[in-house]
């Protein structure tokens, strides 16, 4: 008896390309960079080199996103993809903040943990996956904007909770808040005028 072999059918090539790119970034680039202080260059730490069980938080939303590329299109699927991308983005942020706290307690309070290339690529890919899913939902422009704002909500909650305070980016902002705020206001004036 011949066993019929079926090859998986890709239903969302955009999402598949995003997820394959994410795997390359996750395993080929540094997720964070750790330096003993501000004056010394940091050394890159890949995602799989982070301490604790934190990286395991990424598996479920990443697996859902990969599986979604092979699932027939539906509104429920697109909503699930948007939520999974938002959760993956939040998990990436939490993981970076957690590693920063760990390094600050293990090395010294002067230790600096900055976001590496893998973080930025993965964050962008999460945003692209969410934007693609929201676009496929066929929402009106106002609702699409609202849905994409909702994708950022978990990240904003993490920021407000203080979970990202140990990251060097946040430390720099805290040290030079007036300069950052003035520059931000100036940029808004330029954009809105």
In which residue ranges do the predicted regions lie?
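Loop-to-transmembrane-helix entry motif
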Residues: 187-191
């Amino acid at each position: 008896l011949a066993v019929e072999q079926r090859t998986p059918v890709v239903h969302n090539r955009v999402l598949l390309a995003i997820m394959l790119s994410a795997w390359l970034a996750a395993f080929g680039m540094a997720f964070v960079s750790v330096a003993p202080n501000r004056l010394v260059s940091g050394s890159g730490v890949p995602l799989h080199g982070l301490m604790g069980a934190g990286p395991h938080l990424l598996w479920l939303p990443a697996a859902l996103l990969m599986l979604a590329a092979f699932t027939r299109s539906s509104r429920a699927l697109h909503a699930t993809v948007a939520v999974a991308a938002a959760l993956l983005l939040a998990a990436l942020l939490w993981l970076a903040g957690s590693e920063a706290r760990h390094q600050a307690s293990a090395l010294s309070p002067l230790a600096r943990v900055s976001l590496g290339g893998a973080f930025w690529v993965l964050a962008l890919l999460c945003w692209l996956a969410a934007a693609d899913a929201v676009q496929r939902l066929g929402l009106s422009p106002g609702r699409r904007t609202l849905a994409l704002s909702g994708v950022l909500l978990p990240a904003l909650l993490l920021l407000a909770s203080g979970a990202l305070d140990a990251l060097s980016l946040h430390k720099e902002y805290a040290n030079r808040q007036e300069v950052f705020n003035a520059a931000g206001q100036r940029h808004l004036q330029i954009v809105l005028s």
